[in-house]
Every structure is written in C-alpha cells, then in structure tokens.
C-alpha cells in the first residue's frame, strides 16, 4: 500500500526523492511525497511454480549479458501502443503518459526496479537482470496482475456509455456522505502530513463560510453574529468583549493571527468529531431553508460546522488524488513489465532458432502437404483408371482389322494355337472362335464379377467356357465346338473319329468323362467340329435380312435346312455366327466411324473422382446410335436355341428327355 510520507515545500523544488517515491500534487498549496512499498517481490514460495521457474532459469542461462540487456529494453512507443489497446479510460491514459514523461524528465525512480532514460527507453535494473528468480517473480507473478487490474477498471466505469473510471469521472469530485474514505487516507499519512492537512487557511475557511450562509439563507442579524464568531476564531476579535461566548466550542482549535492559519488537533477522535458535525450537510439532513443564529454560541457552532465541511472536502480531495495516482503508477509499472516480458520471450525464441509463429506456420504447411499428398493420390488413382479404360477399349481401326482378318482367314485357321488340320482325316472344317463381350456389346465396360470371356447370363447356350459350365456343358454342340466336352482328355485321342456329327458322341461320352473333365479346367484344347461333308467349305453369303427368318417361328425347318443342306458343306454354328456378326459389323461400320463409344466416353466428364461406371447419358447415346443391336442379338439367341433344339431332336430324341434342364 502506498503511503504519504512527507510534504514538499515550495522552497524545496529539488526534493531528493528516493526509490519508489514520487510527488503527489493535491492543490496549489499542498504537495506530498507518495511512497510505494517493495513487498511486491516478497512472495510466498507457494505462489511460485517450481517447474516453470526451472524452465525460466534455463532460458535465462541461454542468453548472454549483451543479449539480456537488449532483451530487457523497450521503447516508449511499445508501451503507449499497449496502453491505447488495453485502457478504455481516457483519464487513465493521459495520467500514464504524464507520469511517464515526468519520470523521464525528472529522473525519479518511481518505477523501481524499472527505469526510464532520457531518450524514453524503458529498461530494468542490473540487479534484476542477473537474478533469474527475481526476474521470474517480476514477470510471471507481479506482471500477472495487469489483466485483473484492467478488469477492475472496466467494472468501475460510470455507465455503459461513459468509458471513464470512477477516479476520473466528474461525479466522484463531489463530496459524498461520510464513510471510511477519510479514515483510509488519514491512516496512510505520516504525522507531518497530518499536521499539514490539519492546518486550515483562514481565507479558504471564510470562502466556505460564505457559501454556507448563502445556501441556508441566513438573515442579516444572524450573518453578523456568525462573522463575529469567525473573527473570534481567527483572533481578530477579543472573545472577552463578546457577550455569550462559549470557549468549549472552540476547544482543540488554535489560530495564528499573523499567518492567518487555524490549527486543528491531529488526534483522530477530534478529527472525527469535527467531521461528524458536517455529516448531516453531506447526507442531506439540512434542507435549503432559512436558518438563524440568535446567540454567539449558536454562531460558534455554525462556524465549527463550516470548518468540518472544509476539512472533509480537503481529505476527500487527497483521497481521490492518492487513489488515482496509485492506479496510474501501477498501470505504468505493469505495462512496462509486460512489455519487457514479451521482449525477453521473443529473444529467447530467437536464440532457440524457432519462434512460436514459425512453429505455427510450420504446422500449417505440414497440414497443407498432407492435403496435397491426398489430392495427388486421388489424381494418380484417377489416371490409372483412365489408362486402364483406354487399354481395355478396342480402337475402331483395330476392330475393323480384326473383322477383316476373320473374313480373309482360311476356314481351317485355328486362333488359339490348336493343331492344324493337315491330315486327311482332319481335313474337315476346324474352327475355334473366341467371342468376347467387347465383340458383342461393342463396349469396353464389363459387368462386375465376370471375366472378359464370361457369358454366364446366356442360360446355358453361351459359347464361352465359364458360361457353359453351369448350364449345357454336357451333350451340346456348343460345348463340343468350344473344346470343353473333354473327348481328348478322356483318352480317345488315339482313336480315329467316325464320320458324322461329333456332338452325338459327346452326348454318349459326357457321363463317363464328366469327372475327368472338371479336373482339367485350366487347360482345354480345342476339338474341331467335324462336318458330315469333307469337301472344302465355301463362303456362304449372309445378309442381315436373314434375321427375319430367325424371327419367324414357322420357318424353323428352313433355318435347319439352311445349315444342313446338301448343297453346302456341313458347317458348325459358330461359323454362321461369325458371318452374322461380320456382316452386321460391316453394315454398321460407317455409323461407328462417325462417333465410337470410346469417343463418347472421352467427351463425357466424370461427375466425381470415384466414379467407376458409364454414365446414363453414354448408355442412352449408345442405344440411340446402335438401335438394331439388341434386336439382332435377341433374334440370334432365339435362332440359336431353336437350331440346337431341332438338331438334338433330329439326331437323338431320347437323349433330350434326360437333358431338358441342360437345354433350358
């Protein structure tokens, strides 16, 4: 707590202020010396964090003496910038700026251990620089009170619109009902200060008396009696010549006629008695009404009341100045400590090689790198999908060349590396055709879960290996032509095959070779389909209009005769199917050249990065471009089923009874 320890006389212009002392200006006639205690650094060990203190000591040892001196030096601009941001009260800001300028100009050590140089630089004393414990206590124990002090100032504002604190508002300058204020300021005064406060100037007291008489509208006679009582107090009138004078009323008062002073007894009880007479005046007990002083003793009491009013106003002014100056000094002290602490922390971080801001930016950059890495992985994944799609999609010219090669190849050509039919026994037509989904659907997309050669959805009549296994693998021309009937694997390779249809033999041998055939699915040889005629096969022209024959149920015999007519050599149904698709592809080649499915897919954009399917727009465009595809495909499938059924009934109707499930 600050104390008033001395009075500065006008003759003592160069008063020797000690550490933590500063002048307190009360009025034109009174200036006191305000002293602050140094017990702020004498703290209990429980208030100090041991772990944080050890860390601070390590940071303190990292700095050299030169670095420490530079770190514990801040300019006035840094202090004033923090001041304008933290303090809402205009009066507090002006008082802090005034005190900073006063300390800088006079050189007083009011902010010890802080000091302000002539150039306006705030620094710390050498004893605190070298002692890490004191420095820690100053920064993190005393300096932590800044926020609480600012909160206190904000709470003491007078009204929501008024940003001034209670010490700098206009209302506080008016005297209020007596309370403990005068006692608080009276107790922190030294005897010298009390004597100075108890010394009342006669002219000031007379001015207070005139205001009092005017306020209560005393009559002229009563005013004269009050003035006579005042003259007796000041020694201008001999009390022995005044009738009705009471000496007990002025007990404890002493006047100096030559100097014009009135001395009051400095005892606390007497001061309380004098102030007690003026309490009704501040509490509102006396209304503005006409008052009288008919006798001298009553006039003496009125003078004593005015003396109490004057003393209370003086004590209230001292209390207000004292509290405002203490708040100003503490605010400037805490602002300086906070600025030094920040400068010290910045210097320590620079010595360590990384600052908090750099660490923050580093964390942000790491997060951005992680996000970029994720985006790069997504782009690579998308590119892999796109490349895979491009590889799976056959080019238009490749499809053309493949169809042309199939049409130009000799009838006895084997695609998958089967044995050529060079012997006389095997001069019959041998053909192996691998029909893929790409050839049927003209698309690079496949159904999920199916291999490129899969036709599982063909209901047992598919030409692929996987599609025929669950359905009509045994006893069908398709299975025999595909090489999955396993005649060769059953041990019949050494026998010469008899003339006629080999599929009939498949029906007879399928039961025996069923188990052996299933164990050899990984490697299947192609067995040529023998035709009944050994003559060389001729190219049979096929027109797409023949699809009408397949679509007509009444012309099933014509279709059968077309395949088995004696004018033409016996041909496997695979051959007719190749001719069908070859002609159909040639008729639609011009349309595909206009815009292929690959071009449609390349033009379309994926709606999302994770899209794996063809969009509905692409499917709709494909259907509009190839309108005859599904119709011809269904007609061909129906024709194939009917041909196979008629073939089985014509050759061996008894076998069809037990194999109905395989056919259907």
UniProtKB/Swiss-Prot annotation:
Which ranges are annotated Polar residues under compositional bias? 452-475
Q: Which UniProt keywords apply?
A: Cytoplasm, Developmental protein, Differentiation, Spermatogenesis
Name under which the protein is recorded: Gametogenetin-binding protein 2
Organism name: Xenopus laevis
Q: Where is this region: Disordered?
A: 375-425, 447-476
List locations, semicolon-separated.
Cytoplasm
Basic residues compositional bias: what residue ranges?
376-388
Q: Sorted alphabetically, which InterPro entries does this protein's record hold?
A: GGNBP2
BP terms from Gene Ontology:
cell differentiation; spermatogenesis
Q: Name one GO cellular component term.
A: nucleus
The record ties this protein, via PANTHER family, to: GAMETOGENETIN-BINDING PROTEIN 2
């Amino acid at each position: 707590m600050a104390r008033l320890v001395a009075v500065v006389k006008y003759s003592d212009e160069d008063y020797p202020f000690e550490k933590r002392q500063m002048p307190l200006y009360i009025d034109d006639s009174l200036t006191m010396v305000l002293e602050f205690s140094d017990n702020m650094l004498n703290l209990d060990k429980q208030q100090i964090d041991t772990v944080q203190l050890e860390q601070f000591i390590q940071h303190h040892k990292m700095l050299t003496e030169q670095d420490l001196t530079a770190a514990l030096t801040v300019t006035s601009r840094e202090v004033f910038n923090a001041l304008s941001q933290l303090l809402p009260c205009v009066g507090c800001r002006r008082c802090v700026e005034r005190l900073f300028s006063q300390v800088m100009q006079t050189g007083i050590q009011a902010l010890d251990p802080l000091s302000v140089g002539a150039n306006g630089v705030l620094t710390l004393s050498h004893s605190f620089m070298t002692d890490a414990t004191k420095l820690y206590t100053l920064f993190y124990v005393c300096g932590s009170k800044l926020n609480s002090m600012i909160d206190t100032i904000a709470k003491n504002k007078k009204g929501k619109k008024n940003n001034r604190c209670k010490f700098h508002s206009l209302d506080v300058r008016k005297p209020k009902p007596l309370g403990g204020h005068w006692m608080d300021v009276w107790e922190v005064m030294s005897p010298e200060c009390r004597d100075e406060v108890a010394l009342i100037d006669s002219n000031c007291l007379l001015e207070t008396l005139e205001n009092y008489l005017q306020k209560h509208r005393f009559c002229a006679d009563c005013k004269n009696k009050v003035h006579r009582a005042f003259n007796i107090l000041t020694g201008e009138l001999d009390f022995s010549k005044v009738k009705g004078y009471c000496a007990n009323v002025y007990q404890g008062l002493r006047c100096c006629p030559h100097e014009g002073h009135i001395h009051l007894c400095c005892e606390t009880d007497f001061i309380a008695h004098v102030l007690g007479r003026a309490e009704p005046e501040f509490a509102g007990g006396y209304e503005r009404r006409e008052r009288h002083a008919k006798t001298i003793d009553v006039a003496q009491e009125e003078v004593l009341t005015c003396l109490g009013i004057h003393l209370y106003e003086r004590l209230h002014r001292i209390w207000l100045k004292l509290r405002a100056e203490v708040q100003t000094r503490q605010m400037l002290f805490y602002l300086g400590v906070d600025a030094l602490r920040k400068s010290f922390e910045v210097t320590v971080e620079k010595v360590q090689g990384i600052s908090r801001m750099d660490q923050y930016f580093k964390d942000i950059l790491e997060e951005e790198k992680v996000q970029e890495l994720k985006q790069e992985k997504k782009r690579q994944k998308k590119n892999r999908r796109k490349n895979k799609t491009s590889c799976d999609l056959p080019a238009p010219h490749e499809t053309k060349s493949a169809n042309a090669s199939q049409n130009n190849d000799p009838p006895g050509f084997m695609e998958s590396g089967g044995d050529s039919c060079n012997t006389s026994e095997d001069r019959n037509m041998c053909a192996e055709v691998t029909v893929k989904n790409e050839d049927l659907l003209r698309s690079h997309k496949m159904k999920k879960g199916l291999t490129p050669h899969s036709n599982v959805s063909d209901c047992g009549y598919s030409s692929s290996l996987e599609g025929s296994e669950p359905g009509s693998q045994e006893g069908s021309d398709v299975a025999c032509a595909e090489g999955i009937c396993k005649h060769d694997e059953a041990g019949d390779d050494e026998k010469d095959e008899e003339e006629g249809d080999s599929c009939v033999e498949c029906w007879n041998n399928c039961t025996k070779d069923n188990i052996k055939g299933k164990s050899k699915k990984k490697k299947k040889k192609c067995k040529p389909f023998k035709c009944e005629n050994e003559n060389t096969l001729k190219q049979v022209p096929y027109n797409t209009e023949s699809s009408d024959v397949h679509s007509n149920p009444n012309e099933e015999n014509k279709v059968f005769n077309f395949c088995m007519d004696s004018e033409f050599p016996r041909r496997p149904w695979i051959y007719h199917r190749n001719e069908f698709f070859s002609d159909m592809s040639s008729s639609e080649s011009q349309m595909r050249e206009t815009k292929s499915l690959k071009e449609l897919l390349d033009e379309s954009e994926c709606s999302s990065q994770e899209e794996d399917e063809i969009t509905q727009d692409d499917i709709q465009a494909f259907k509009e471009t190839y309108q005859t595809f599904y119709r011809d495909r269904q007609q061909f499938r129906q024709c194939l089923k009917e041909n196979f059924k008629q073939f089985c009934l014509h050759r061996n109707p008894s076998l069809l009874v037990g194999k109905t499930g395989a056919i259907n």
